[in-house]
């Protein structure tokens, strides 16, 4: 079923192999009168919340409707790259800290902290190992990257996966909040493969 769903989506032109790298975005929060944001050549290094470009070279931009088909079929790995809130260093002694959960698209893997423009060596290792594991070493496994509407974290993470040789990278700019706005379900999640 999963292989058939991928073949169907490829033949319908919903995956990278069936379309040029330019895509279209559904549920954009950028006003129609705003000038489109140009795709930079490098990573976004700061001010991660803000209008994003409508494209990502080498990736297929997917709409909510397209992602729903992928999600229901299980044909792609959904990767939420929203950063994880860190324990404040100045908490008063004796304060109990509980790592917050995140609500994202059910079945997603939350790869926290991999969408920054510059990654620590530890974050690079975590990201590479996680992609290797979730793709089962198949560089053509469909990988969908998202975080929130108008957030560069997913754009950066998807760009990095492309640079590492992943060939079926999909980018979902509306993020978990765009998914929720479409009245689709969210589920609580914790970071994938991290010690909490």
Residue spans for each PLM region:
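Glycine-rich nucleotide phosphate-binding loop and flanking beta-alpha elements
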Residues: 85
């Amino acid at each position: 079923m999963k292989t058939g769903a991928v073949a169907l989506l490829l033949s319908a032109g919903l995956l990278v192999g069936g379309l040029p790298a330019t895509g279209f975005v559904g549920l954009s929060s950028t006003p129609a009168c705003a000038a489109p944001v140009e795709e930079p050549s490098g990573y976004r290094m700061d001010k991660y919340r803000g209008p994003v470009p409508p494209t990502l070279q080498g990736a297929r931009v997917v709409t909510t409707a397209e992602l729903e088909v992928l999600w229901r079929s299980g044909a792609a790995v959904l990767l939420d790259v929203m950063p994880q809130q860190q324990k404040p260093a100045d908490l008063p002694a004796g304060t109990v800290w509980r790592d917050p959960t995140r609500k994202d698209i059910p079945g997603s893997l939350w790869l926290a902290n991999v969408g920054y423009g510059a990654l620590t060596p530890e974050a690079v290792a975590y990201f590479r190992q996680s992609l290797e594991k979730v793709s089962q070493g198949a560089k053509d496994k469909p990988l969908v990257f998202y975080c929130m509407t108008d957030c560069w974290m997913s754009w950066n993470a998807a760009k990095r996966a492309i640079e590492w040789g992943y060939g079926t990278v999909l980018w979902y700019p509306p993020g978990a909040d765009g998914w929720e706005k479409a009245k689709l379900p969210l589920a609580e999640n914790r970071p994938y493969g991290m010690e909490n």
